[in-house]
Amino acid sequence: MSSFVAKALQPSPFNFTESLEIQNIQNPTDSDLMNYLKFGGMPQRFYLKEESEIKKFLSDLYDSIVLKDIVTRYKVKNIELLSRIINYLSSTSSQIFSASSINNFLKSEGRDCSKETLYNYLDYVVQSCTVNKAKRYDITGKKSLSTLEKYYLSDTGFANLYSTKFNIGAMLENVVFNELISRGYDVQVGVTNNSEIDFIATKNNLKEYFQVSYLLFDENTISREFGAFKKVKDNFPKYVITADHFDFSQDGIIHKNIIDWLLDK
């Protein structure tokens, strides 16, 4: 049984390679990537042609599987609060998360939520595999940090279900995170003084470092993305992943086009 047929038996998203397989796409283009970023990899959605049909499918999936599964399993009483928390995580995917920021968001809507309830609901959402949490790691101090983590959606289609803005950079980062997880890596967000490295991916005691950006528009962008590794003193591989088709590799840091990287080329 092929990988995509096996996955079609359960509501788990395809990765990019599997999404191409089910669509019989041999030579993917940027348009295929954007379609995946926007609508995600849920197997059933590839049988739908119209954007309105795909959005309705994702909305129904969100209501019937995500919300109802969590509500039933954990006996959640405040369903509307749970929904708003999930929507907040969807709209802020790939951003640093803090309890105060989501509390301010909820208060702006006239909602009260204790820290205990908030963290319980967050844990329920993570346990449901709707989102995954990436802790921060202090590269200089060599220790994991317990606050200001990031959350990534298991499927990017949910991020664009209710949002009016399509943040390509955030979705690319989300897809790279999911791909690293699917490849068996433990993934953390790297912290060096006042800067950040998107991902430290560890497997079998070996590390790889990743910066993810949409495009390397100018010298400032190139300097920022490649300069993120300056504080890293080890010799493990370092990658900058973007949608560019020109190779900007420099100083031992490897630049990869995201489609090539996702296809493991």
Where are these regions (language model features)?
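Catalytic cores of nucleic-acid endonucleases
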Residues: 190, 214-258
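Short regulatory helix/loop adjacent to the ATP-binding pocket of P-loop NTPases
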Residues: 1-9, 23-24
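Active-site regions of enzymes building and remodeling cell-envelope glycoconjugates
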Residues: 6-9, 250-264
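Accessory nucleic acid-recognition modules appended to NTPase machines
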Residues: 51-206
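Conserved small helical "lid"/interfacial subdomain of P-loop NTPases
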Residues: 11-29
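Structural motif
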Residues: 206-208, 237
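Amphipathic alpha-helical "lid/sensor" segments that cap RecA-like P-loop NTPase cores
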Residues: 24, 28-63
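Conserved RecA-like P-loop NTPase ATPase core
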Residues: 19, 37-40, 125, 155, ...
